[in-house]
């Protein structure tokens, strides 16, 4: 697909083929407002004021223009799960709340399985739960295809990362994704939904999924998935 800009959330990657014309051109990183709460003083909220643009690279383009590029091999064509049967559908709700339990650890864990926190600290949750490494939150079948609706009920974006298996974008903010997009970090905008499909191929065992904003992850927004 042809784009003029690419939004990269924490941990995102993108492969770009740049069409250049003669001259000097800059590649810039532009800050994105990912929402926030005033009480967080910027630590868990938006980019700091004034940090709007950073020049990453400058290209000087000259020489004879290339008439055309060779086509890409079909062996690189990614799989499209929209044409395949879905084994299960799930909804994962990403939310936030003030911690209530005095001295309890993440997910009621022990001193070794969860970090004890101030009861007044913010908690970031998935389906109302904070992370507990001793709890399996999702069990999926090896070779299955699942459709997940990622629902963000908080006032800030959550870039969601699933270890091992990439996610194909199906719908974002109520709009069907027309082109074929695979990501291993999917941004879920504030107060919005994103639907993805996942093919649980090639690997079995336990791993995690979590928000890729490390503050949110550390405050509980992570879960355990087991594929078997």
Task: Report each predicted region and the residues it spans.
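C-terminal soluble interaction/assembly domains
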Residues: 166-204, 208, 215-222, 226-228
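Extended terminal and domain-junction accessory segments
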Residues: 1-157, 199-206, 210-228
